[in-house]
Swiss-Prot record:
Region (Disordered): 1-36, 721-762
Name under which the protein is recorded: Probable ubiquitin carboxyl-terminal hydrolase 12
Coiled-coil region(s): none
InterPro entries: DUSP-like_sf, Papain-like_cys_pep_sf, Pept_C19_DUSP, Peptidase_C19_UCH, Ub_carboxyl-term_hydrolase, USP_CS, USP_dom
Keyword line: Hydrolase, Phosphoprotein, Protease, Thiol protease, Ubl conjugation pathway
Alphabetized Gene3D superfamilies for the sequence: Cysteine proteinases, DUSP-like
Family note: Belongs to the peptidase C19 family.
Active site: C320 (nucleophile), H935 (proton acceptor)
């Protein structure tokens, strides 16, 4: 199974990569894995040693900027979970909660302690230096295994290609045994791991040691089978395995990469017994048995004779992207005939500096001959892959690749190896600045002639066409017409890529009801800023900068999305709760205002008055915006809180109620205070709710994840303490391990946050007057009676308030989200989309020769010249900024009689009656699954019998032509029909 990356794996020379996955196979070096984790008891020590966010940024930045170059053979690279890495980045950007310990469990096979297979760089993991790794583990602790990795050279000494070996090959070892008892052993095979740059001699020594072989008299078989092997196997079972080959011991000095053994595979060791190989003896015995049944065997062989061209390709480890493209290409009749007849040898160009010395053409010819040999049911293209990888390091390892990118590289390599031009002349492509049919035709012919002066091969004859591009200046209407060759035609799919979500908007005006706003944005790469502007327009908010975007979870803030232009909406999943709060005024960096998150809990009266461990969340949190003057007045803070609470209850005079006793007596009007609340009221009066304060010195706007409400100080007590006492953060805000289940189990991780309080930092005189400072969070604790009276679900008295927490007005979008509509898309629709006029973006303007300025010109594409073999690349994968997506919609395409005549510019302008451009389908390259984990297969029509077959790596089955039209179709191969 393959995962797909729209771009090729990056290659790094010398400098350490930010993340690199040149190797991507099923296991990791088990000798390098050490299980390290941190207990809850260790968390306190870690959090005390954690520097401030600014200090962390500085220290990590210095290490990254001064990191050394990659050194061959050094194990100084570490694989880091990308999901934890993103949480860290969000935390350091003050955009998310504390990330918890370095959590590797999502990328680790916890049963074996190894790295999970098929992981993708920059999606599943990133790679950091040892120094950065050590720093992160010291600061945050470690949860799960660590994965140190070695630097290897996948190039040559003269042209080094240093990479981090993410997946060193692991070899499963099976011993061939003639002992009936041993041969029936069902234990799993033993395994050894080596670097891909180890030699064959290193491998042989490892096999001998691991299997405890008594002597050097053994030989090694490489086996490709879908059936799992056990620790031992008997000779009769072994010879039934179709795909196996003996490893040549004469090449002991060659590396595993050079031998094509740099991916994990199964090896069978066979020891000589009495100077006889057990496999040879078993084969002779099998031959004698077949001789006895010669006649029936001949009949069976006649019936089972394989059709040439129906040979599968073994998956060498994430190579189905290559296998599917090869099956499509090798079923091109003209290409097959050219290479099987050895005609290619007369045209190979070994001196072309842009070519591969004829090596790609040679290995491709060998591959085609193997695939069309009736002897093979399946073939392992190891040497082919090794040759391709030598010229393009992206395909050297076993990482996930794009089938279209591989095909483009292979066709270009074959073209240059077969280029009939030995001395390429200098040419200059003409441009046309007027719309004149005759001049357009002449310019197109000249462009093709010049192209052929430098590029002339069978590949050009078969696969290359030409398209016309027309640009029009929006200011002066200057027209520019150019012609360029293509090998395949990339077609956009006419599918709307929309982002839709229903969010909750809390107005600043407490007399207004919260709004549930349906958001539909016509770009999956839209930003938080796009969302805020949309909500501001729909809600009537005068200034979108006054809106604070948050994600909530179970009554708490999970993160604050303050990076408006940088954060993508696609980072928000369908189930995420998004709340947008309108502030009184814009809140920007440098503002004297502070934002204080407010949580609400109701006390269970069945517990003692001094215990807050049984408190429970209710409602949803909100945010108070307080100015410099407002944070010094406890009565003002209380009044402001009550005013905000009034937005969520039908009790509209809540701001005038000052105590629990006033509610119990039911004389609300008599209890109205004419002035502000006296903080030093009679202690016999129980306040409507108590304000408790939590501080986090690391988060500008704290989320309070994993905080305990036990022992939180009252806001008024904080005032009396003069805010100068130093409080041990973990003593004051410790994690309760017994009863506070409502707060412990809802968080993403189970580790405490670091240093929640002032940590030995005394406040200045100005700060000394404040009751609240930056990094504070309020927890309003409502006694049960207050809670029931103000936020009753079913009020028993007219004087009681009914809860409005769950009530909101709905605003539907005027844009319909039809992204899930089942409208049929055809190939013609895609061609229409390709031909549509579009405006260039701000980032890629065109220089107008008349205006002498860069302009966002209009651009239209048109096929001008159709090739004999027409390959359509359906653009199912999109990439905008950090977001990548796949379109899985079905595109219906014709199996026969695709008419391209009226879509081809040269045909439309031709004066004579040329034969129509009619095409028939002969191959389809399919991709199933998404970007994070998919698989390639192919449908191909046999050139001899006209039967379509499905090629799923080594498995080959016949199919009906209609079965080739699926939503997985990625590359379509058409051949022009001739008279």
């Amino acid at each position: 199974m393959d995962s797909l990356s729209e771009s090729s794996t990056s290659s790094y020379h010398g400098k350490r990569p930010r993340s690199l996955s040149e190797e991507s196979q099923s296991s990791s070096n088990m000798d390098d894995i050490s299980q390290k984790s941190i207990s809850l008891g260790d968390a306190s020590e870690i959090s005390k040693n954690l520097p401030s966010i600014a200090e962390q940024k500085q220290l990590i930045g210095e290490l990254v900027n001064n990191q050394p170059e990659l050194e061959l053979g050094q194990v100084d690279n570490y694989i880091l979970s990308y999901s934890w890495y993103e949480r860290l980045c969000s935390y350091l950007a003050e955009d998310g909660p504390f990330p918890g310990p370095v959590d590797q469990e999502d990328i680790a096979d916890l049963e074996t302690g190894t790295l999970k297979p098929d992981l993708q760089e920059e999606i599943d993991f990133t790679i950091i230096s040892r120094d950065v790794w050590d720093l992160l583990v010291r600061w945050y602790g470690l949860k799960g295994p660590e994965f140190p990795r070695e630097t290897v050279n996948l190039g040559s000494e003269s042209h080094p290609h240093l990479v981090v070996e993410v997946y060193p090959p692991i070899f499963s070892l099976t011993l061939l045994s003639t002992n009936a008892v041993d041969a029936n052993e069902s234990h799993k095979p033993k395994k050894i791991s080596l670097s891909s740059k180890s030699t064959l001699e290193d491998l042989l020594e490892g096999v001998k040691y691991t299997l405890s072989l008594p002597s050097d008299q053994f030989r090694l078989w490489r086996v490709d089978t879908d059936q799992p092997l056990h620790r031992t196997i008997d000779p009769s079972s072994f010879i039934k395995i179709n795909s196996k080959e003996i490893i040549d011991f004469l090449e002991k000095s060659k590396t595993l990469v050079e031998l094509g053994m740099d991916s994990s595979c199964s090896l069978v060791a066979e020891c000589m017994i009495n100077e006889t190989w057990p496999v040879d003896r078993a084969l002779r015995l099998q031959f004698l048995i077949q001789q006895r049944n010669n006649q029936s065997s001949n009949e069976e062989q006649k019936q089972e004779k394989r059709v040439p061209g129906t040979c599968g390709l073994s998956n060498l480890g994430n190579t189905c992207y290559m296998n599917s493209a090869l099956q499509c290409l090798t079923h091109t009749r003209e290409l097959r005939d050219f290479f099987t007849s050895d005609e290619w040898k007369n045209q190979v160009n070994e001196s072309n500096p842009l070519g591969m010395g004829g090596q790609v053409a040679s290995i491709f010819a060998s591959l085609i001959k193997s695939l069309y040999s009736p002897e093979h049911s399946s073939f392992a293209p190891r040497q082919f892959k090794a040759t391709i990888g030598k010229f393009n390091h992206s395909f050297l390892g076993y990482g996930q690749q794009d089938s279209q990118e591989f095909l483009a590289f292979l066709l270009d390599g074959l073209h240059e190896d077969l280029n009939r031009i030995y001395q390429k002349p200098y040419t200059s492509k003409p441009d046309l600045y007027e719309v004149d049919e005759e001049k357009i035709k002449n310019t197109a012919e000249e462009c093709w002639r010049l192209h052929k002066l430098r590029n002339d091969s069978l590949i050009v004859d078969l696969f290359q066409g030409m398209y016309r591009s027309t640009l029009v200046c929006p200011v002066c209407n200057t027209v520019s017409i150019t012609f360029d060759p293509f090998m395949d035609l990339t077609l956009p799919l006419p599918v709307k890529q929309v982002w839709s979500h229903t969010v909750t908007f809390i107005p600043a005006d407490t007399n207004l009801t919260p709004l549930a706003i349906e958001v539909v944005l016509e770009s999956k790469a839209a930003t938080i800023e796009d969302l805020v502007k949309y909500v501001a327009e729909k809600s009537g908010c005068s200034d979108y900068r006054k809106i604070l975007v948050t994600e909530t979870y179970k009554g708490r803030f999970y993160r604050f999305l303050t990076q408006l232009s940088k954060s993508l909406l696609m980072e928000i999943s369908e189930e995420d709760e998004i709340y947008l709060y309108e502030l009184e005024r814009p809140y920007e960096d440098g503002s004297d205002d502070i934002l204080v998150p407010v949580y609400h809990i109701s006390d269970d009266s069945t517990n003692s008055a001094n215990s807050y461990m049984s408190s429970r969340d209710f409602g949803h949190p909100f945010v108070l915006q307080l100015s410099d003057n407002e944070v010094t007045d406890a009565s003002f803070i209380s009044e402001k809180l009550k005013l905000k609470y009034q937005q969520f209850t039908t009790l509209k005079n809540l701001k005038n109620i000052d105590s629990l006793e006033s509610l119990e007596l039911g004389h609300e009007d008599e209890q109205v205070q004419k002035g502000p609340l006296d903080v030093d009221m009679d202690h016999s009066q129980t306040p409507l709710f108590e304000m408790r304060v939590f501080h986090d010195r690391f988060e500008k706007i704290p989320t309070g994840w994993n905080m305990s409400v036990s022992n939180l100080p009252l806001l008024t007590e904080r005032d009396k303490k003069d805010l100068e006492s130093t409080v041990d953060p973990l003593d004051a805000h410790s994690i309760e391990e017994e009863d506070d289940s409502e707060f412990k189990d809802v968080a993403p991780g189970s580790y405490p946050e670091p240093s929640k309080s002032n940590e030995n930092t005394k406040l200045t005189a100005k700060e000394n007057d404040r009751l609240l400072i930056q990094g504070d969070l309020l927890v309003c604790e409502w006694p049960e009676k207050s809670y029931q009276f103000v936020f009753s679900v079913a009020p028993s008295s007219p004087q009681m308030g009914r809860s409005l927490w769950l009530e909101s007005k709905t605003i539907l979008s005027d844009k319909k989200d039809d992204s899930e509509d089942s409208r049929t898309i055809t190939l013609n629709d895609c061609l229409d989309e390709f031909e549509k006029t579009e405006q260039l973006g701000e980032e890629d303007p065109w220089y107008c020769p008349t205006c002498k300025e860069f302009r966002q010109a209009s651009k239209q594409m048109e096929i001008w010249r159709c090739p004999e073999i027409l390959i359509f690349h359906l653009k199912r994968f999109s990439s905008e900024r950090r977001f990548r997506d796949k379109i899985d919609d079905l595109v219906e395409f014709p199996i026969d009689n695709l008419d391209m005549s009226m879509r081809t510019g040269s045909y439309k302008l031709s004066e004579k009656e040329n034969p129509k451009l009619i095409y028939e389908l002969y191959a389809v390259d399919n991709h199933y699954g998404g970007l994070g984990g998919g698989h390639y297969t192919a449908f191909a029509k046999n050139p001899d019998n006209g039967q379509f077959y499905c090629f799923d790596d080594s498995r080959v089955t016949p199919v009906c032509p209609e079965e080739t039209v699926t939503s997985a179709a990625y590359l379509l191969f058409y051949r022009r029909k001739t008279s």
